[in-house]
Each structure stands twice: as structure tokens, then as C-alpha cells.
Amino acid sequence: MMTFNDLPEDLVVEILSRVPAVFLARLRSTSKRWNTLIKDGKLSKKHSSNAPRHSMALVLIDHKVYSVRSNLRGIHNSVAPYVNITCHFSLKEHLSNNYSTEVDIGHVFHCDGLLLCTTKDYRLVVWNPLSGETRWIQPRFCYKKDDCYALGRSSCNKYKILRQGRLINPSEERYVYNIVGEDLVINNSQERYEYEIYDFNSNSWRSIGVITGLFNPNITSGVSVNGITYWFDISEQFLLSFDFSTERFGSESLPEGDSHLALSVTRQGKRLCMLSTNYTYVTGTNVNLWIATKTSENTRAMSWSKFPILRGGVGLRYRCHFREGVSFFAYQVKEKIVVVSCHRPNRHSKDIIHIVENDKFIELDHHGAKPTHELSPTPRLLIYVPSLVQIQHGI
């Protein structure tokens, strides 16, 4: 009897090209043949055209990346939800003679199947956790602790990296403002930052301008949607964007009256969403989810739809979970919105995963990896859309 291993390779590629990438990840460890096929460029091209997009959640805990499996389907029928932190994606050290040495990750940024990782010792690497492919990015001069990075994609599907680096020496300033849109409000900070673009094809960095700092290095919740990257600006009053096609910054207004906490994307990574809080004397602190709906062609203003998540006030025990550093993703379950949020453990709770829905706050004692102590880095939860996309290699 013919087995799957006996099939011609072209037929196997055709079959696998229709399997969601999230399931292909499980095949990598089953045999060398599967692992080689998953890394193959021919399968990658077919897969991007044929396979449906399925998302999964990842979480960064104690410098390691894990997948998050959740079951929220029965939450409206009094069935207890659960979250498991399961598969550990291992980023290997390329400088070590021992390839089993694992790298500690300080920060991750997702764009269309690739993770841009800043290591604990400030190095930079682009990583596809699904295929295991990596590309270590060398700095123009040296790695710096204060550098911030974002990964994006141009309209011709070329990946680029944006770097924000603080200038120590005022003589380095060149005051180039051509990367700023006319509607962008420049803050009054005296600090100057240089912005550079890394081009994968030429394997090199180039400066695109020096202006006042636009996005706060302490706010690491930037997200990429359709190749454009968004952050809160340093004053947290505007939404800052960077278009990797035009290599220009822009800004969007944010809903008034709320304190803006974190950005995320919808399940398929196609729409921007935001978690915020507002306070009134009568109700106390309330939590809202905002989803970007469209951009006006005339004013280029972004429209938002508001979904109240937690009304009637957040108690003191839970208020600390909705501060800077929180990360989240949102699900739609039976026409209702459920938010899964993540924060560091604190004196009120050792749990880091929480569910907010229908004015209820649910703490989950999840299974799997957990921060080792209260001083561990803040866990980071993000939506990841697996892909077999290959990292562009330059000359």
C-alpha cells in the first residue's frame, strides 16, 4: 500500500500548500523530509497563495517565546475557560559552537509571519518560528541599549526594519525632516533621534532623518497592520504610523476621553485594535476595546468602533492589571467580544492571564510556563499569523 512518503514531491507540496501554517509547525519535528519541505521556497510560494490564514497567540515569558492555546467557546454557557501555555519556540544562538544554546529574547515585534527579536544583550535577529529560519542583523556601528526597532513591509512585499536611535552627541544632528508628514505634531523634547532603515536586499542600513523622538522607547506595544506600523506617540495623545512604502511618518487622532493602554490586532492581523480605560466619579475606572474600522479618503482620519468591556468600575485588586505594560488580544465569541489580557504578577495576584467579558474579570491559573518571580520582565502577549514566508537574504 502506498504511504504519504511514497507520493511524488510535487504532489506533496501541492497538498501541504493547502494546510494552514499553524498545523505545519507540528510536522517539523516528525522527520527530516518534512522539515526540509517546510523550509523549501517552492512550498512557501504556493502556501502563501493557497492556504487559509489562521492565527495563534504567542507570549514572551522570562525571555522565551511560547504558544498560547485557549478555549473560550463555552464562556457564555458557564463553561470555565482555560488557557494553556504550551509549545516553546526555541531561538538558537548562531555564535556558539554548541547549536543547542538558546538565546534570551528581550522584545518581539511581529509582521506577517516574521518576528523581529531584540535579544537580552541588545542584538537583533529576524526569525520565522514556523520554519526555524533566522537572519542576524548587524548594526551600522554597534548595538545600543536605547535603540528601538520595528518590522514592516512595503507595497512590493519587501520587508524592512526601522530603527530609532538616540543621539548622544549634538554634533551628530542633521535635522532632516523629510520623513515627517505635514499633519504630524512634533513634540518639544530636546532629545534627538536618528531614524534608519535596514534593507534586506542590500544587507545595509541607511539614515532617513534626524528629528525629535516620536515614539517612546518605554512603550513597546507597537504593532504592524498591512505592512504599516503603529505606536502611541511619546505624549500618548496621538497614534503614530510609519509607512514602509513611502518611508514617512504620519499621525492619527485617538478617541478622546480615554487613557490609551495598548495596541493589538484582530485575529487575522488585518485590523488595528486598542485597549483603553476611562474614569468617572460615578462608575470609577472602566475598560473599553476600540477597533479601527476605516480611514476617510478625504481627511485620512481613522474611524473607531467602541466596545465596552468592563463597566461599573474596576476594583482596586484588578486596577493594576490595566496599566502601562498590559498586552492583549480580542476574540469574538458568539457575537460577543472577549479580551484576553496579560500583565506581570503583582502583590494582588500571581496569575498573568486574565479574561474580560460581559463586565466580568476572570483570573486564570493557566497551565504551562509562568514568570519565575515578580521582578521578571513583563510578559508580552501578541497575535501571530504563521507563515512559510522566507526571510530575504541580501548579497
Curated annotation (Swiss-Prot):
InterPro entries per record: F-box-assoc_dom_typ1, F-box-assoc_interact_dom, F-box-like_dom_sf, F-box_dom, SCF_F-box_component
Residues in F-box domain copies: 1-47
Top-level taxonomic group: Eukaryota
Chain coiled-coil ranges: none
Gene3D superfamilies, alphabetized: 1.20.1280.50
Signal peptide range in chain numbering: none
Annotated Pfam families: F-box, FBA_1
Record-annotated membrane-spanning stretches: none
Name the UniProt record assigns to this protein: Putative F-box protein At3g21170
UniProt source species: Arabidopsis thaliana (Mouse-ear cress)
Taxonomic placement: Eukaryota, Viridiplantae, Streptophyta, Embryophyta, Tracheophyta
